[in-house]
């Protein structure tokens, strides 16, 4: 029996004996056990197979059609080693086209899996990934233009775990699914018959698609039996449009050890951790007593996202300590970040994100008509209208003829697959200035093919846990600056993407292609 299997059996057996009598039945019956994605490693030929298909999943007692990689919902965690090439064979068993994007990986445009990397129904695509970047938690998901939001909503997402020599020398928790736990958080909206209820319309093109049910690794409010000691959580905000703000129900601190692109120089202690759509953070939390506690998400001031039940702290998962000790530690130092180079003489690119004023107004009107003032998340409606210079929106009924599919733009242009906007020089630092001035919507801006450093975020210096390697930056009614460098080729036919990771904004034009 392998050590991991032995530990799993030990944990399972230990749960019953470690809990008081009154809570054993509760643990067994009240909540589902946190599903743990398989950790997928290469076969003898250094290959990995991913099959995209439809299946069925049960939520709240009702069965829904869902999509997954190698299963009914979500997918495995693909384990990659720095310096080792891996070929991934991707089979599409859906009845429609899809793509598979390696979010956070520094790989050439040809294998990045953007909207050009189409896999037809019944088709296959093989990509070879030569990983040369630090240990990190990344992920993979569809990037089919105009349909990314729907395909992710249906269940397509999986993790990528990159390992290197440096991280293996640290005494971090590393028993997969025991004290090293993936946590993929997504909200879903269901129809009355229990199916995933996705719409791309004026309202969702403006504020994004959101639901009233929170899933953690595909389960509603699951529980995890955690050994005593340090518990490592690999957090992914896999929501289409909802930002999250993680905390613990008993106010025990989170120690952030890694962001999108890898380890921070040292742990950063926080009481709450905002995470934007597409972002990953690794945190350690101390499980040093017998008291169960919840990982929760706190209310956020984002349009549409303060509607019940998210107007109050909402449970993500229950963590139940058991009478087994883990061996992981919280190191004082983690990694070394290179000093920022001089910014003198660098190419500066200015990207202005914009939403059609008509879309902004019509979407907001529909949101308020459906959900009331609570949908405004505490924002002053008149101030917002004034900020956008729109005046009264009650005259904005265009009978549904408004073309929202190209209403979101960058530098005045909606996405055009055949026209990259610019060419970045390979191996050269550039300073990108990304502005959201002109609307009050949240735009988590993601850049393919790189891990960058944030120079300023929404007009302020980045928080300590956001000053490491990142692939997504917050833009919300202000300006953010990032220092980027691209080490791989991305010719016109395999251009990289840069876009808002609120998926409905991306699907309706807020994306550009660029070459390297």
From Swiss-Prot:
GO molecular function: copper ion binding; ferroxidase activity; oxidoreductase activity, acting on diphenols and related substances as donors, oxygen as acceptor; oxidoreductase activity, acting on metal ions; oxidoreductase activity, acting on metal ions, oxygen as acceptor
Signal peptide: 1-28
Regulation of activity: Ferroxidase and phenoloxidase activities are enhanced considerably in the presence of excess copper ions. A labile regulatory copper ion near the T1 copper site is important for the copper associated activation of enzyme activity. Ag(+) acts as a potent inhibitor of oxidase activity by binding at Cu(+) binding sites, blocking Cu(+) substrate binding and oxidation. pPD oxidase activity is strongly inhibited by sodium azide, an inhibitor of the electron transfer.
UniProt entry tagged with the keyword Coiled coil: no
Modification after translation (UniProt): Exported by the Tat system. The position of the signal peptide cleavage has been experimentally proven.
Cofactor note: Binds 4 Cu cations per monomer. Contains a mononuclear type 1 (T1) or 'blue' copper site, and a trinuclear copper center consisting of one type 2 (T2) or 'normal' copper site, and two type 3 (T3) or 'binuclear' copper sites.
Region annotation Methionine-rich region: where it falls in the sequence: 355-400
Similarity remark: Belongs to the multicopper oxidase family.
Domain note: Contains a methionine-rich region, which includes a helix that covers the entrance to the type 1 (T1) copper site and blocks access to the T1 site in the absence of excess copper. This methionine-rich insert is involved in the binding and oxidation of Cu(+). It also binds additional copper ions, which are important for the copper-associated regulation of activity. The methionine-rich region provides at least three additional Cu(+) binding sites: Cu5 (sCu), Cu6 and Cu7, which play related but distinct roles in CueO oxidase activities.
Protein name: Multicopper oxidase CueO
Lineage of source species: Bacteria, Pseudomonadati, Pseudomonadota, Gammaproteobacteria, Enterobacterales
This protein's encoding gene: cueO
């Amino acid at each position: 029996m392998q050590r991991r299997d032995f530990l799993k059996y030990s944990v399972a057996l230990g749960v019953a004996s470690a809990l008081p009598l009154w809570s054993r039945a509760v643990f067994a019956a009240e909540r589902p056990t946190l599903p743990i994605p398989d950790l997928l490693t290469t076969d003898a030929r250094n290959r990995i197979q991913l099959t995209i298909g439809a299946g069925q999943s049960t939520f709240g007692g009702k069965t829904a059609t869902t999509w997954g990689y190698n299963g009914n919902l979500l997918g495995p965690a693909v384990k990659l080693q720095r310096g080792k090439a891996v070929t991934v064979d991707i089979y599409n068993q859906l009845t429609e086209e899809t793509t598979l994007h390696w979010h956070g990986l520094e790989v050439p445009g040809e294998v990045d899996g953007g909207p050009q990397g189409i896999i037809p129904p019944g088709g296959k695509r093989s990509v070879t990934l030569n990983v040369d970047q630090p240990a990190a938690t990344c992920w993979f998901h569809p990037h089919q233009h105009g349909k990314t939001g729907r395909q992710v909503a249906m269940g397509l997402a999986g993790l990528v775990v990159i390992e290197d020599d440096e991280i293996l020398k640290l005494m971090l928790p590393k028993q997969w699914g025991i004290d090293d736990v993936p946590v993929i958080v997504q909200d879903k909206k269901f129809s009355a018959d229990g199916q995933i209820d996705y719409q791309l319309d004026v309202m969702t093109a403006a504020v994004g698609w959101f639901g009233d049910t929170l899933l953690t690794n595909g389960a509603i409010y699951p529980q995890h039996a955690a050994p005593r000691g340090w518990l490592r959580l690999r957090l992914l905000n896999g929501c289409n449009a909802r930002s999250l703000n993680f905390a613990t129900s008993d106010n025990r601190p989170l120690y952030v050890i890694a962001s999108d692109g890898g380890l921070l120089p040292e742990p950063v202690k926080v009481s709450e951790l905002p995470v934007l759509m597409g972002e990953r953070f690794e945190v350690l939390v101390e499980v040093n007593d017998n008291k169960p506690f919840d990982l929760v998400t706190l209310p956020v001031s984002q349009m549409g996202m303060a509607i019940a039940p998210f107007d109050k702290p909402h449970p993500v998962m229950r963590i139940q300590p058991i009478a087994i000790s883990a061996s992981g530690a919280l190191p004082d130092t983690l990694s070394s970040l290179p000093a920022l180079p001089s910014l003198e003489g660098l190419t500066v690119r200015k990207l202005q994100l914009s939403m059609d004023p008509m879309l902004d107004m019509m979407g907001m009107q529909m949101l308020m008509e459906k959900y009331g003032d609570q949908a405004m998340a505490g924002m002053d409606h008149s101030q917002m209208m004034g900020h956008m210079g729109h005046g009264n929106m009650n005259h904005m009924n265009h009978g549904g003829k408004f073309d929202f599919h190209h209403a979101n733009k960058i530098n005045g242009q909606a996405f055009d697959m055949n026209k990259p906007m610019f060419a970045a020089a390979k191996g050269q630092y550039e300073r990108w200035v990304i502005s959201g001035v002109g609307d009050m919507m949240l735009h988590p801006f993601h850049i393919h093919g790189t891990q960058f450093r944030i120079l300023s975020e929404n007009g302020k210096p980045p928080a300590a846990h956001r000053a490491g390697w990142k692939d997504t930056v917050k833009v919300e009614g202000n300006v953010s600056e990032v220092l980027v460098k691209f080490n791989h080729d991305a010719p016109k036919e395999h251009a990289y993407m840069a876009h808002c990771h609120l998926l409905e904004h991306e699907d309706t034009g807020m994306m550009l292609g660029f070459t390297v």
